[in-house]
Amino acid sequence: GRQWRWQRLADGSQVAAISFAAEGAQALRLGVLAQELPAGAVLRFYGAAGDKVVEMPAAELAALRLTNEAAGLSGDAARMVWGPDTAGAQSTLEVQLPAGATPEQLRLAVPQLSHLTQTVAQASDGIGKNTAQIGDSGSCNVDIMCGSYQTEGRSVAKMVFTKGGSTYLCTGTLLNDTRNSQTPYFLSAAHC
């Protein structure tokens, strides 16, 4: 945290930012290793000017670390968080420390970057556009455009994940259980 250029804001908080560039990238994702982050701190991710800003509060990062540990990860693997995809060849990570926190309390690194050759929106546009095989589906395939399947059709979602520095886009289905527990079950292909 000491090597950043910190600016003190009127409310006593401090903010600093660092940008990463990858020539030819359509989008980037930053792999952030948050080893120590003061309570109340906020990470912000954004691309080019006018791009939406995505915030990740320290509490959210702590919850993600616990989820990762519950899934069997430990150490740096549990602390690694992938930021959102930001359009363009540049991505900025901004850190805001709350009033009373010091940069010495921050241990943060960006050891990985995923260089996307197309944005997630561009990749999503290509899903399901192959019309050459219309009519070749098996008899067990159901046309969800039929009136009786409209509710089920709204349960399809996309998932973006990064593994080993490569970013993937998959689709899946949101599932409910018979207890209506509101547990967010997501069923996808094994390779996802």
Q: For the regions a protein language model found, what residue spans apply to each?
A:
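Domain-level representation of secreted and single-pass membrane ectodomains enriched
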Residues: 1-166, 170-192
